[in-house]
């Protein structure tokens, strides 16, 4: 009896391993995709894409995340087929740090980062020693610092660009106190800060209209365009042509324009 139970257990474990292997390899289904997005604009846009896809026989299941780490992990591990939430500098940094085999296949929308405040209405109202929030992940933190520099709050060391950290601040005339926080949590902590740089998806999720509520915002032609990402092995799969065509359609462009009123800019 013991040998029979042991053999059965081995078969069970083997079947699990086989199932996992099947989930992370092979061509993506032409009838079903599981897509990871962050809550807010990326979720809303993908819901529109899913609506269009349904009419073409493609079912898109949307999994919503509230932070920036797990969508890439889940994709690499095979729990997702596609994700749509990040810009290329973030992807490049993230997959390099974690040795992930995932790649960009299309661009989506540009979501300008803004500076927000519940205490002041103009960036020039900042005072000596005020607290300034920014994302704690390397790429979005650098993006925020570059925005602060353009806004005239600081000067960064020459050449650091999207590798900038708070240690690269060369000049800080107001001796501002820079506080690094989880990007998704910054809107919740805005009342405790003089100002903060907030990614547009999280700003919209918390009820802000970036073009109206930010006190300073990136230029519309900033290079931080968002992208669709898949596993390297699936980058040429036929179903992705359908997904990209639907995403970059006139129907979706109109939806973005009407829904976000200039806070998001289509890349196509």
Predicted segments with their positions:
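Periplasmic-binding protein-like
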Residues: 140-149, 247-267
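C-terminal motif of bacterial Sec signal peptides marking the signal peptidase cleavage site
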Residues: 15-19
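Short helix-initiation/N-cap motifs at beta->coil->alpha
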Residues: 63-73, 161-188
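Bacterial signal peptide processing site
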Residues: 21-23
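A conserved helix-loop-strand patch within extracytoplasmic ligand-binding domains
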Residues: 105-154, 253
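Short, well-ordered beta-strand elements
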Residues: 28-40, 58-64, 131-132
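Ligand-binding "clamshell"
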Residues: 93-105, 120, 192, 197, ...
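A bilobed periplasmic-binding-protein/Venus flytrap-type ligand-binding module shared by bacterial periplasmic
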Residues: 112-123, 225-237
């Amino acid at each position: 009896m013991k040998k029979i139970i042991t053999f059965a257990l081995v078969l069970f474990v083997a079947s699990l391993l086989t199932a996992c292997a099947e989930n992370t390899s092979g061509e993506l289904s032409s009838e079903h995709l599981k897509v990871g997005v962050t809550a807010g604009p990326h979720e809303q846009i993908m819901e529109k894409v899913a609506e269009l896809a349904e009419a073409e026989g493609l079912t898109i299941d949307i999994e919503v995340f509230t932070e920036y780490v797990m969508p890439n992990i889940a994709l690499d591990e095979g729990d997702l087929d596609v994700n749509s939430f990040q810009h290329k500098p973030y992807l490049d940094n993230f997959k390099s740090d974690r040795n992930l085999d995932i790649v960009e296949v299309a661009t989506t929308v540009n979501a300008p980062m803004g500076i927000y405040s519940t205490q002041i209405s103009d960036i020039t109202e900042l005072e000596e020693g005020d607290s300034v929030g920014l994302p704690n992940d390397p790429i979005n933190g650098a993006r925020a610092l570059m925005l602060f520099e353009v806004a005239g709050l600081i000067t960064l060391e020459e050449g650091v660009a999207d590798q900038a950290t708070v240690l690269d601040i060369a000049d800080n005339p107001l001796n501002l106190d820079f506080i690094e926080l989880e990007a998704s949590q910054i809107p919740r902590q805005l009342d405790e800060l003089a100002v903060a740089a907030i990614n547009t998806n999280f700003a919209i999720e918390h009820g802000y209209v970036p073009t109206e509520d930010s006190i300073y915002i990136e230029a519309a032609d900033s290079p931080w365009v968002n992208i669709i990402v898949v596993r390297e092995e699936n980058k040429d799969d036929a179903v992705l042509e359908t997904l990209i065509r639907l995403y970059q359609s006139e129907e979706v462009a109109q939806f973005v324009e009407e829904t976000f009123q200039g806070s998001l800019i289509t890349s196509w």
